[in-house]
Amino acid sequence: PYKAVCTHGWVVDGEGKTMHKSLGNGIEPKEIYDKNGADILRLWVASSDYHSDIRISKPILAQLSEAYKKIRNTARYILGNLSNQGGFDLDKDGVAYESMEELDKWAIMRLDNLIDKVNEAYNAFDFHIVFHAIHNFCVVDMSNFYLDIIKDRLYCEKPDSAIRRSTQTAMYRILSAISRLVAPILSFTADEIWSYMNHCASENPESVFLNCLLYTSD
């Protein structure tokens, strides 16, 4: 028994041709997760628009592996800056939204937009929109803009300065949200990120899956 079901088109090769053993154009799932890991296989499924035929090839998987690295590297950078110089405890060091720096408020605003878009996409079973939204957020909003601008705060300000704590508060909320939002797709990666976080009292540190997955900022 199930409440909903998705159907999809044929899985075809990179050129759109039907896979046949005689053509040698098939790819075994085991070959993918042995080489790239299970999360890359899950990401391929999620990134595909299942309303039409779904293409798979080694170049497509290579592109997805690079996209995956962007998301993972964003999480790793944030984790590093929440754990260095004595670490960051949201319950003790967190800054209230109204007292945060304007740039950090902007980051939270962009995060809220992402949460709304991803929640809407999950509810509509548009998993490819989930992937593209999270990837664009990590690359465009975070890596190319926000995380680049805040480097001086993180590396030059005193560890417990108000401006640095403001940034760390935003980073914590971003990391917590991203972990939850990607968990249905990048399950192993999300749980690994979660295991390294110094969690606030309202979160269950045991597993990301023991928390509300479709996270809201309220």
Regions found by a protein language model. Give the residues of each.
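Hydrophobic, well-ordered secondary-structure elements that form the walls
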Residues: 5, 16, 71, 142, ...
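Core structural elements
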Residues: 67-76, 105-113, 132-152
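Beta-strand segments within the central parallel beta-sheet cores of soluble alpha/beta enzyme folds
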Residues: 3-7, 207-210
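Short alpha-helical scaffolding segments that buttress acidic/His motifs in well-ordered protein cores
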Residues: 5-6, 40-47, 75-78, 134-138, ...
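Acidic, turn-prone loop/beta-hairpin segments
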Residues: 85-116, 148-217
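Catalytic adenosine-cofactor/nucleotide-binding cores of aminoacyl-tRNA synthetases and other
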Residues: 10-97, 199-204, 208
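Short helix-adjacent coil turns
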Residues: 122-129
